[in-house]
Amino acid sequence: MKKPVLFLDFADALGKLRKNDNFLHNLLARHYDVQIVDTPDVLIFTHYGTRNRLYSCKKIFYTQERYLPDWKQCDAAVTSVFTDHSRAYYYPFFAAHRKGEDLVRPANFDCQRILNEPRGFCSFLHKYANHSVRPRTEFFHELNRRKKVDSGGLAFNNVGYEVPGTAGRAKMAFISQYRFHIAFENRLSPGWTTEKFTDAFEAFTVPIYWGDEHALQWFNPKSFVNVRSYKNFAECCDYIMHLENSPSEYAKMLAEPPLKGNQVPEIYSQDKLLEFLVREIDRQEIPAARRRWFWPLTRLRLVKRDRIHGE
C-alpha cells in the first residue's frame, strides 16, 4: 500500500540534526513517505531556538528536557514531563534514551556472576554540583562520610581522572565497576525521569534514586533504593550501609528485575507515540501560527532580527 506523502522539516534542534535520519523522522517513515522540504506542511521543533516562529504550517513541539509547550506556537507536543493538555503526549526521557527490552531480565539471569565481580562501593558521575542541585550535593557528602564514594565527573572528582562525558560507553564502563550508583535528577518535576536512573540498571548496579515518584508506576521498587521514601538523607544512607554490610540483602535487591512484572510497560511504546503523531498531523485545522492576527508582522520582525535572507 502506498504511503501518504508528508512534507516535513525540523527547526531549533541542538547541534547538527540529521533531518533524514533521526528518531522522529524514522518513526514517521513507518506511516508516511517523508520528504524533507524548506516549505513543509508540518514542522517539528524544540526549545533551543526561535526559528520555528518563521513558519505558519502545523507545528509539533518535541523535547527531552523539562520544558512545556507554548500553545501559541504549536498545535501538538511531545514532552518528557506531564501536562494535562489534550494535545500533548507524554514520552519520558528514559523511553527515548533506550529500549525497554534492555531492562528485561532473562530467565537465566546470573546474579551470582555479578556478585563475584570485584566491584567497588558506590559511584557518582556529574559535571557540576552547586546550589541548583543541592540535594545531590548534600547526599554525596552524607554517604561519602560513611564510606568513600568514587566520583568520576567534574563534581567532587576523587578518582584521579575524569570519565569522558556523563553518558555513553564511558559512563557505563565506569558505573559498572560499583555495587551502587547515585542517580539523582537535577530537579523534581512530574514525569521527569531520565537515563540517570535506567543506566544504573543496565550496568547491573543498584540505583540510589532521587526523582519523581511516578517512576514507581513502571519500575520495581524492590530493585533500587528510593531516597524519597526515607525521612532524610541520613536515614537513607544508614540503609545503604546496611545493604553494603549484608551481602545477602544486597544480592536480593540486585536480583530483582528493574521493570514491574519483568515486562516492558506501555509507556515505552513507539507505536502509541506514532499513533498520536499521525492523529495530530492528519487533523484538519487552521494551524496555531495562522490563528494569530499579528502573524505577518511577527514573521517580518524575526526575519530582520535573525537576518534570514530569502524568507
Residue ranges and their predicted role:
Residues 2-62, 67-150, 155-183, 190-311:
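Pol beta-like nucleotidyltransferase catalytic core
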